[in-house]
Amino acid sequence: MNERSAPIGVMDSGVGGLSVLAEIQRLLPNETLLYVADSGHVPYGEKSPDYIRQRLRHIAGFLREQGAKAMVLACNTATVATVADLRALYPDWPLVGMEPAVKPAAAATRSGVVGVLATTGTLQSAKFAALLDRFASDVRVITQPCPGLVECIEAGDLTSPALRQLLAGYVQPLLAQGCDTLILGCTHYPFLRPMLADMVPADVAIIDTGAAVARQLQRLLGERDLLADGPARETAFWTSADPDSLKKILPMLWMQSDRVQSFPL
């Protein structure tokens, strides 16, 4: 296998990163993808940075053993806790992380009020505070931690009345304060777009960073002459939880796949 045809590793604390995986496949259809769902340790948002760093070192080492030419941290919480650590550990390995879309949201808002839905870990991080200082000094940013949403999505619940009530409890206070731009600061949350679209006025912009991450990955691979010229092989999945659970939820969030294996804990 030459370097161009080597796979790209993508990880998340669970299934949320599938929203990013879809954007990567859309932009880079010739690339072979590997996906690790660390669902046995979800949610990351309530875990300590040291715990998350330990998990990410393990996952990164595994993906390198699989021959991954690059790694995407398709998880905001993992990015803020570990991306600097991983870049120091693997300085020549292309690494792409996630961050809430503060810059485009601050540019898009008309009311001057931006809402952020994210995990506690992301919202309390120094990296997020730096994003606000850099790009959002002229707008009001209202942050909303969203406990419970990740767990619902991990269980395959995208439509229940209980989920709708939970989500409305997070979104309605932001709208009441004049928010006209909503940042989805967790890769699980794009799967709630249909429900959100029913819940917010049509002129409220909903922004996530999946497509931007795919473009950044394309740029990094292009700079290193690592873009594949195809054809892609079938995506392989690993999970630190029950593989049958991931097999059941994949058709809802991605597509049917039997290539689901247990991730070595």
Curated annotation (Swiss-Prot):
Q: Which PROSITE patterns match?
A: ASP_GLU_RACEMASE_1, ASP_GLU_RACEMASE_2
In the Enzyme Commission scheme, what number(s) does this protein have? 5.1.1.3
Under the heading SUPFAM superfamilies, the entry gives: Aspartate/glutamate racemase (SSF53681)
State the Pfam families in the record: Asp_Glu_race
Instruction: Give the residues the record marks as binding substrate.
Output: D12, S13, Y44, G45, N76, T77, T187, H188
Catalytic activity field = L-glutamate = D-glutamate
> Which pathway is this protein assigned to?
Cell wall biogenesis; peptidoglycan biosynthesis
Give the domain of life: Bacteria
* Active site per the UniProt annotation: C75, C186
User: Is Zinc there in the keyword field?
Assistant: no
GO MF, one term, reads: glutamate racemase activity
Enzyme class at the top of the EC tree: isomerase
- Gene3D superfamilies registered for this protein in UniProt: 3.40.50.1860
> Where does the chain cross the membrane?
none
What are the BP-aspect GO terms?
cell wall organization; peptidoglycan biosynthetic process; regulation of cell shape
Keywords of this protein's UniProt record, alphabetized? Cell shape, Cell wall biogenesis/degradation, Isomerase, Peptidoglycan synthesis
What family does this belong to? Belongs to the aspartate/glutamate racemases family.
Q: What function is annotated for this protein?
A: Provides the (R)-glutamate required for cell wall biosynthesis.
Q: What protein name does the entry list?
A: Glutamate racemase
Q: Which organism is it from?
A: Pseudomonas entomophila (strain L48)
Its taxonomic path starts at: Bacteria, Pseudomonadati, Pseudomonadota, Gammaproteobacteria, Pseudomonadales
Q: Which gene encodes it?
A: murI
